[in-house]
C-alpha cells in the first residue's frame, strides 16, 4: 500500500490516458460571458479508471466494406520511363508549394450523399474571404473555415462525423490576421501556415476572449482529443494590454497531435499573458517541438500526464514553464533573460533535462523536496551560469552540468539496493553516432519549404497511373509503380487525404520523400497476403537490407482494414547516409477503433478471435532511422462509433538497428507481447516512451501471454519465467532489452489501469521492464503505475514500485546497467 502522502501526490498530479469527461469551454464562442474559464486542478481519485466511450459517426457510408469489395486501379496507358521521370523546378514558381498544388483529398468513408460536397483543404483567404492585411477582423472567416462540413450536411461542430470522418486542413497564407475573438478547433482540424513567411494571428486591442485558440474540441474529453495540429504560424498578443489576462493557446489534447514551428509573441513586463495551457481537462500528450516564446508572464502552464519538449526557446519570459505532470523531458531547450526557467513544483514523477541552456536566468529549475522517490531530477549536459537547481527554495546546484546529475533513486546493475541521491554526478558515455557536436542529434519536421511546386508529385494525379485513395480501390500496383518510377532525390510524393487500400507490400525505395495531409492520409492493408502469422509480411517496406540513402515519411497513418495476423505494418531496412535522411515525423499507427476496418466491428469481445496485426514497426539490424512524434495505438475504444474493442496486436515497436536510432516523442499502447523491444540493438537514443498495457489482459483474461500468438519470433518474450496461470505476470512488457548495448533512454513510462477490462485491486501487473545480456544501458526518468516490479534483470527483481513510490506509482531517477 502507498502511504497517504504518496497517495495524495498521485491523486494530485496524475492524469488517466483515456478519461473522457468533457470540460466544456462554456458554450458559444460568440458570447463573451461564455469565455470565462477557470483552470481545473486535475485530482482524479486513486481508484478512478478510464471510461472509454464512442463518438457518433452518423453520416458514415454504412455499405463501405474494403475488406470485401475491391477493384484494382488500372493502368490506362504507358507511363513515364524512369529516365524521363526526374522532377525539375518550375522557373516561375513562387510561394509555398502546399498552397499551390491540387488538393483532391476526401473523407473516404463519409456517406456518398455528402462525400463529394466535403472539402478537406480550405484556404481561409481564397475560399472564405479572410483578411490577411491586419486591417479587418479575420476571426469569423477562419472560424467558418474550421467549422464547415459538407455543403449539404451538418457542420463539424455537430458531433456527427466521428473522429476520423471530418478531417480539415485550414491553410493560412502569409499575412497578418486580426483576431477580435477566439478560434475553436474540432477533432481532425489541422491549421497550417506558410513556413516561408509564417502568418500571424494577432489579437486586437479589444480582444474579447481569454484564449486566442481553443484546440480542445469541447464536445469531448481531453484524452480523446486526437488528430489535431497547428504548425508554421505565429500567435501574437502584443496588441492586448499587458495588464489584461489572456492565453494564446489552449492545447488540452492527447496523442496523435502536433504543435510545431509555432511562435508565441507576447509583451514583455506583463504578469498576465500566458503562451500555452493544458489545464482544462485530463490529457495525455507526447511531444511539443520546435516552438519559440517571446515575452509573457509564463510560456507554458501545464497539467498533464507526460511530455517531451524538444527544441523550445524562451526569451524574456518571466517563467518559462510551469510543469505539472508525472514524466517530463526537456531536450535541446533554451531559456534566456527570465526569472525562472522550469517550475517543477508540480512534477510529481521525474523531470529530465537534456542538452539545455540557461542564459541570464535567475534560476533554471525549481522543484519541491520529497520524502519519496518522486520529484526526481536528472540533468544531462546542461549549461547555466547561475542557480541551476533549487529544491525547497534552497540552491542545490549552480553552474554547468557537463555530464549527468541525478537527484533521486539511482540503481546499478545486479544490485537491488538503490542509492538515494541528493545530487550525484555520474558518467553517461554517449555514442558519437547519435550526436551533433556534443548534443544528441535532433531535427525539425521537414516542411520542404525549399521545394518548388514542380518538384511535388500528387500521387493521385500521375497521368496513366491512377491512384484513388477512396477506401475501396486496390491501389497497391500503381502506388508501387509510381514510387519506383519517381525514386529521385528531388521529388516529394504527396498523398492527399483519403484511405489507400493495399493488398500487398508497398516498397519505399531510397530517394523517396512522402508527405500526407496530417491524420487524413491513411494506408490500409487487406487481403490474404497478410493473413499468415507464421510468415509476417510488411505492408510498408522501407528499403532493402544494405540500402543507404534518403527515405522520409511525414503526416501519414498506417492501419489494417481487416483482421490480419500476418501483417507487419512497417519495416525499415534502409540506413541514413546522414542523420535524419531516413525518418518518420507525425506518422502514426491505428489498429481497429475506426471506420473502414472490419476490426472495429469484429473485435468486440475475445482477443483469441482477433489477432488483428502481427506488429506495428520493425527497425531491422541494417536500419538507421530518426522517428519523432509517433503513436502506435491498438484501439481500446471506438473512435467512430460505440463498438467495444478487444484487439490483439502482437507487437509494438521492435528495434534491432545498430548504426544509430533516434526515438523522440513516441507512444506504444495496448499491444500484446510488448510495447518496446530492443533486440541486439546498439546506439539508440530515446526521449519519451509512453505506453499502456492492453485493458483486456490480467486477472480473468481469456488469453494469457503469449496466447493468442502461437508462432513466436526469436525476439519475442516467451513468459517462461511466469507460472502457467499467473495472469498478472503474463501481461505485455513495457520494455524488453536483450543483447543490446549503448542505449540512452530518457523518460519512459508505463500506465496500467485494468485487468480484463475491469477493476484490479492494488497492483494490476507484475513486471514492466526486463533487461538481460546487455551492456552500457542508461535509463533516466522511469515511471510506472500499478506495477509490482519496475525492473527485472532476467528473472531477478532489481527495482519494485513499492521501493520507489512516487509520481503515479513508482519513479526511478537513474538505472545504469553494466555502464
Region roles according to the model:
Residues 680-696, 701-708:
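Active/binding-pocket-proximal capping segment
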Residues 181, 189, 295-297, 305-319, ...:
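Internal alpha-helical scaffold/solenoid segments in large eukaryotic proteins
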Residues 154, 167-176, 180-189, 490-512, ...:
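Conserved SET/PR-domain catalytic core that frames the SAM/AdoMet-binding pocket
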Residues 481-486, 492-501, 505, 650-680, ...:
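C-terminal, well-structured subdomains that either form a transmembrane helix-short loop-helix hairpin
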Residues 2-6, 11-169, 182, 196-240, ...:
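Extracellular "leader-to-stem" segments immediately downstream of a signal peptide or signal-anchor
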Residues 175, 180-204, 228, 504-525:
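Beta-solenoid repeat scaffold
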Residues 749, 766-774, 778, 782-783, ...:
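Long, ordered, helix-rich scaffold segments
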Amino acid at each position: 500500500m502507498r502511504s497517504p502522502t504518496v497517495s495524495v501526490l498521485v491523486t494530485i498530479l496524475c492524469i488517466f490516458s483515456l478519461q473522457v469527461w468533457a470540460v466544456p469551454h462554456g458554450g458559444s464562442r460568440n458570447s463573451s460571458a461564455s469565455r470565462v474559464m477557470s483552470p481545473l486542478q486535475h485530482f482524479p481519485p486513486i481508484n478512478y479508471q478510464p471510461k472509454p466511450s464512442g463518438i457518433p459517426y452518423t453520416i458514415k457510408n454504412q455499405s463501405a466494406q474494403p475488406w470485401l469489395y475491391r477493384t484494382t486501379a488500372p493502368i490506362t496507358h504507358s507511363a513515364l520511363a524512369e529516365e524521363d521521370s526526374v522532377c525539375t523546378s518550375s522557373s516561375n514558381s513562387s510561394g509555398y508549394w502546399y498552397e499551390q498544388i491540387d488538393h483532391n483529398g476526401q473523407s473516404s468513408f463519409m456517406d456518398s450523399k455528402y462525400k463529394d460536397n466535403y472539402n478537406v483543404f480550405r484556404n481561409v483567404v481564397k475560399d472564405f474571404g479572410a483578411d490577411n492585411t491586419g486591417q479587418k477582423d479575420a476571426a469569423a472567416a477562419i472560424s467558418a473555415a474550421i467549422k464547415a462540413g459538407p455543403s449539404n450536411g451538418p457542420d463539424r461542430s455537430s458531433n456527427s462525423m466521428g473522429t476520423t470522418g471530418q478531417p480539415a486542413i485550414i491553410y493560412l497564407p502569409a499575412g497578418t490576421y486580426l483576431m477580435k475573438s477566439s478560434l475553436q478547433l474540432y477533432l481532425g482540424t489541422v491549421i497550417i501556415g506558410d513556413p516561408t513567411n509564417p502568418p500571424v494571428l494577432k489579437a486586437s486591442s479589444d480582444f474579447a476572449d481569454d484564449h486566442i485558440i481553443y484546440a480542445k474540441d469541447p464536445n469531448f474529453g481531453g484524452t480523446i482529443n486526437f488528430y489535431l495540429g497547428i504548425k508554421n504560424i505565429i500567435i501574437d498578443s502584443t496588441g492586448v494590454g499587458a495588464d489584461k489576462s489572456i492565453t494564446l493557446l489552449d492545447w488540452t489534447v492527447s496523442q496523435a497531435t502536433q504543435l510545431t514551428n509555432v511562435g508565441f509573441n507576447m509583451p514583455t513586463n506583463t504578469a498576465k499573458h500566458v503562451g500555452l495551457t493544458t489545464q482544462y481537462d485530463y490529457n495525455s500528450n507526447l511531444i511539443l517541438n520546435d516552438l519559440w516564446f517571446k515575452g509573457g508572464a509564463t510560456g507554458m502552464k501545464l497539467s498533464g500526464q507526460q511530455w517531451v519538449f524538444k527544441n523550445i526557446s524562451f526569451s524574456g519570459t518571466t517563467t518559462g514553464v510551469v510543469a505539472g505532470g508525472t514524466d517530463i523531458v526537456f531536450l535541446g531547450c533554451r531559456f534566456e533573460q527570465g526569472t525562472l526557467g522550469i517550475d517543477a513544483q508540480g512534477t510529481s514523477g521525474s523531470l529530465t533535462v537534456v542538452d539545455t541552456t540557461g542564459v541570464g536566468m535567475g534560476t533554471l529549475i525549481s522543484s519541491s523536496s520529497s520524502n519519496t522517490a518522486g520529484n526526481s531530477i536528472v540533468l544531462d549536459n546542461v549549461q547555466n551560469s547561475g542557480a541551476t537547481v533549487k529544491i525547497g527554495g534552497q540552491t542545490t546546484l549552480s553552474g554547468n552540468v557537463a555530464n549527468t546529475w541525478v537527484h533521486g533513486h539511482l540503481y546499478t546493475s545486479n544490485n537491488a539496493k538503490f542509492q538515494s541521491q541528493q545530487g550525484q554526478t555520474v558518467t553517461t558515455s554517449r555514442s558519437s553516432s547519435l550526436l551533433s557536436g556534443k548534443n544528441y542529434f535532433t531535427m525539425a519536421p521537414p516542411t520542404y519549404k525549399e521545394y518548388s511546386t514542380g518538384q511535388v508529385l500528387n500521387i493521385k494525379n500521375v497521368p496513366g497511373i491512377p491512384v484513388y485513395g477512396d477506401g475501396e480501390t486496390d491501389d497497391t500496383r500503381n502506388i508501387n509503380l509510381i514510387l519506383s518510377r519517381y525514386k529521385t532525390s528531388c521529388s516529394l510524393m504527396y498523398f492527399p487525404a483519403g484511405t489507400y487500400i493495399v493488398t500487398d507490400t508497398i516498397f519505399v525505395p531510397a530517394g523517396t520523400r512522402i508527405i500526407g495531409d496530417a491524420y487524413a492520409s491513411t494506408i490500409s492493408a487487406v487481403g490474404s497476403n497478410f493473413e499468415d502469422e507464421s510468415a509476417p509480411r510488411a505492408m510498408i517496406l522501407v528499403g532493402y537490407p544494405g540500402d543507404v540513402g534518403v527515405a522520409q515519411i511525414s503526416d501519414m497513418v498506417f492501419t489494417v482494414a481487416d483482421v490480419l495476423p500476418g501483417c507487419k505494418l512497417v519495416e525499415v531496412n534502409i540506413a541514413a547516409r546522414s542523420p535524419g535522411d531516413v525518418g518518420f515525423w507525425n506518422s502514426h499507427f491505428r489498429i481497429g477503433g475506426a471506420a473502414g476496418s472490419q476490426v472495429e466491428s469484429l473485435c468486440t469481445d475475445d482477443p483469441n478471435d482477433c489477432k488483428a496485426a502481427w506488429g506495428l514497426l520493425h527497425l531491422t539490424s541494417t536500419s538507421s532511422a530518426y522517428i519523432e512524434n509517433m503513436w502506435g495505438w491498438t484501439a481500446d475504444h471506438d473512435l467512430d462509433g460505440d463498438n467495444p474493442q478487444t484487439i490483439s496486436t502482437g507487437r509494438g515497436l521492435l528495434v534491432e538497428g545498430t548504426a544509430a536510432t533516434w526515438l523522440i516523442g513516441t507512444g506504444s499502447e495496448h499491444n500484446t507481447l510488448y510495447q518496446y523491444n530492443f533486440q541486439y540493438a546498439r546506439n539508440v537514443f530515446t526521449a519519451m516512451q509512453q505506453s499502456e498495457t492492453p485493458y483486456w489482459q490480467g486477472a480473468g483474461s481469456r488469453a494469457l501471454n503469449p496466447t493468442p500468438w502461437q508462432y513466436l519470433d526469436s525476439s519475442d518474450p516467451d513468459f517462461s519465467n511466469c507460472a502457467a496461470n499467473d495472469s498478472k505476470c503474463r501481461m505485455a512488457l513495457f520494455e524488453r532489452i536483450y543483447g543490446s548495448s549503448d542505449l540512452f533512454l530518457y523518460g519512459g513510462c508505463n500506465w496500467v489501469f485494468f485487468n480484463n477490462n475491469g477493476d484490479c485491486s492494488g497492483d494490476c501487473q507484475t513486471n514492466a521492464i526486463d533487461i538481460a545480456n546487455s551492456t552500457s544501458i542508461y535509463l533516466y526518468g522511469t515511471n510506472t503505475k500499478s506495477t509490482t516490479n519496475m525492473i527485472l534483470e532476467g528473472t531477478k527483481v532489481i527495482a519494485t514500485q513499492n521501493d520507489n513510490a512516487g509520481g503515479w506509482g513508482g519513479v526511478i531517477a537513474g538505472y545504469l546497467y553494466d555502464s
